[in-house]
Amino acid sequence: MQLHELKPAPGSRQKPTRKGQGIGSGLGKTAGRGHKGQKARSGGGVRPGFEGGQQPLQRRLPKRGFTNARFKKEFAIINVGDLDVFEAGTVVTPELLLERKMIKKLKDGVKLLADGNIEKALTVKLHGVSEAAAEKIKAAGGQVEVM
């Protein structure tokens, strides 16, 4: 088989319907739009969420809560188990993790979580450390410093 011999699978492609092309096509005259009315006109139809003048659902329900999404800090995540690749006594910094490609980018900082185990004593200097992760690092004889 060559490139010019490729064909779509049978039944996978359907001919487009040509609306308004005569009564024999099945979609002539009104072209499937019915008679008159807003939806029959060109450019006609109602906006999404419009309920015909009835108070729309979005306005019937009360406003609730508050979001700080624009200013939310997003951390690059790394787990305690991932740090086992370093030799004992290493100072683990965001720059080192980036250099070793253990995180893709710094974002708003790096946070250490407690998944996995560690046997080596490391000094960890990151932007965030969970309590459980800090306990595991200290139990292995390491130090934790939050930047």
From Swiss-Prot:
Residues 1-65 are annotated as: Disordered. Keywords: Ribonucleoprotein, Ribosomal protein, RNA-binding, rRNA-binding. It holds the Pfam family Ribosomal_L27A. GO terms for cellular component: cytosolic large ribosomal subunit. GO terms for biological process: translation. The keyword Ribonucleoprotein applies. The keyword Ribonucleoprotein applies. InterPro entries: Ribosomal_uL15, Ribosomal_uL15/eL18, Ribosomal_uL15/eL18_sf, Ribosomal_uL15_bac-type, Ribosomal_uL15_CS. Binds to the 23S rRNA. Belongs to the universal ribosomal protein uL15 family. Part of the 50S ribosomal subunit. This is Large ribosomal subunit protein uL15. The gene is rplO.
